[in-house]
Design a protein with these regions (language model features):
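Helix-terminus/linker motif at the lipid-water interface of multi-pass membrane proteins
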Residues: 22, 26-44, 113-120, 176-187, ...
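Transmembrane helical elements of multi-pass membrane transporters/channels
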Residues: 12-31, 132, 143, 166, ...
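Transmembrane alpha-helix boundary and packing residues in multipass membrane permease domains
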Residues: 17, 21, 32-33, 50, ...
Length: 452
């Protein structure tokens, strides 16, 4: 693969994944804008529930990324039979997590909400939302595992089409049911949950139909789920367990923002919701870069050319730096127009503006270290580095410092947000060293007699 083919392969995946992430997050942004117009308490309740969804999504990402790391290397070798074994493993784990979470939320909804806020009104709104949204978990798991499998074979277009469909369906139903338009009942947060559930069911159904009808390499049969290959299971878990730690820590770190700010006041929760949704949308560019880099790096390792992998890693880092600077500037200039779409109190609006000013600077550093770590290092098969780095930063720096500043020192919400994101600055140095001077390339595939 020459440089032209490398850039073509990377940007073809990158652009589709970024657009998919933007459309997906647009669903959440539209939900928040509509719920923000409906009421600040409703917005805060759904925001708290979404932290549960975020933690759940992090677990699915771990199993999905483990699948992609393996499958992309087998994809480089054009061996498809081992890929099916890995995909079936990941799917079983994803479904198991969905069932467990559904059971826990069904039995302990209020206790789950208490982890994120102590405000009784917010808890009541959140429980109403949870009552319906819990039914999305199984459909979401199947969809995410199938999309990860397709991504490992450089197929990403279907993900974008599904996201656009979900955006249209979810926003349309939400508009009707949240506010009670066109003679429909006014359901508030329950209406928002119904819209999300409908979109998730349609996503899952259309994707399964696509895989059955169109996918020639990864079409799974029932027998694929019944087979047991203990060697593949050990290999898969060896990669996935550190990813679970990594994604779990990242989920906890993100949820801590809601936990810490949620115990300040409702204005801080609403401001964080508005700011974080815009930040996450711009962050889609970095997330897409990491996902595309992971597939390209894994595929190249599977082809067996280590010098080519090193050269591509250098080129990718330059792209990540450019992405960080342009993304930070973009976030700075769009913050006011986007915030004006929200019906926030003056206090919440002022806080949201402060948060976004801080996040504009954070973005510059995040857009380098996160894709370099999650795309190059992790995509190369070295997963424990990220787990160790995040464990150190989150457990020893971010959480203790943020809790101290919020609850002991009585710091302002803006200063607390700085503390919650301080790891994005710290991690740049070890990530740069690891990519350029450390060892991170690992061949994970096994020699097999099974023809692809």
């Amino acid at each position: 693969m020459n440089d032209r083919e490398f850039y073509k392969s990377f940007f073809r995946l990158y652009l589709v994944l970024v657009l998919q992430n933007i459309v997906t997050l647009s669903v959440n942004l539209a939900d928040n804008i509509m719920l923000g117009s409906y009421g600040e308490v409703s917005l805060s309740g759904v925001t708290s529930v979404n932290q549960i969804q975020f933690l759940y999504q992090q677990l699915l990402i771990a199993f999905g990324d483990g699948m992609v790391i393996f499958c992309s290397q087998y994809w480089g070798k054009k061996q498809f039979a081992p890929m099916k074994k890995i995909i079936a493993l990941a799917m079983r784990f994803g479904i198991a997590i969905a069932v467990i979470l559904f059971a826990v939320i069904s039995v302990f909804p209020e206790q789950a909400m208490l982890c994120f806020t102590s405000d009784r009104q917010i808890i009541e709104e959140g429980v109403r939302y949870l009552h319906t949204i819990r039914f999305t978990y199984l459909f979401f798991a199947v969809t995410q595992m199938l999309l990860a499998a397709l991504r490992s074979t450089e197929v990403a277009g279907i993900a974008l089409r599904l996201s656009v469909m979900a955006l249209v369906v979810n926003c349309g139903i939400n508009y009707v049911l949240i506010f009670g338009r066109f003679g429909a009942p006014e359901l508030g947060v329950t209406g928002a949950a119904i819209g999300t559930l409908t979109a998730r069911i349609l996503e899952c159904g259309v994707l399964i139909f696509y895989v059955i009808r169109k996918e020639q390499y990864l079409r799974l049969q029932l027998s694929d789920f019944l087979k047991r290959d203990w060697q593949f299971l050990r290999d898969y878990l060896k990669i996935t367990l550190p990813l679970l730690v990594l994604c779990g820590l990242w989920g906890i770190n993100t949820a801590m923002q809601t936990v810490v700010l949620g115990h300040m006041n409702s204005a801080a929760i609403a401001a964080n919701s508005a700011a974080s949704n815009l930040y996450l949308m711009v962050k889609s560019a970095a997330v897409g870069a990491a996902s595309a880099a992971s597939v390209v790096i894994g595929k190249t390792i599977g082809m067996g050319d280590e010098e080519l992998v090193k050269r591509y890693a250098r080129k990718l880092q330059i792209l990540f730096v450019i992405l960080g600077v342009t993304g930070g500037i973009f976030l700075y200039f769009i913050r006011i127009p986007i915030l004006n779409l929200y019906d926030l109190s003056p206090e919440a609006m002022a806080l949201a503006n402060q948060f976004l000013l801080i996040l504009s600077v954070v973005y510059v550093f995040m857009a380098y270290q996160m894709p370099s770590n999650a795309g190059i290092i992790k995509g190369g098969g070295c997963v424990e580095f990220g787990a160790k780095l995040d464990s150190t930063c989150i457990c020893l720096i971010v959480i203790p410092l943020s809790c101290y500043m919020a609850f002991a020192a009585g710091a302002s919400p803006a200063l607390v947000v700085v503390c919650l994101n301080i790891d994005q600055f710290i991690k740049c140095i070890p990530v740069f060293w690891k990519v350029n001077y450390g060892k991170w390339m690992r061949k994970l595939t096994r020699e097999t007699k099974i023809a692809g």
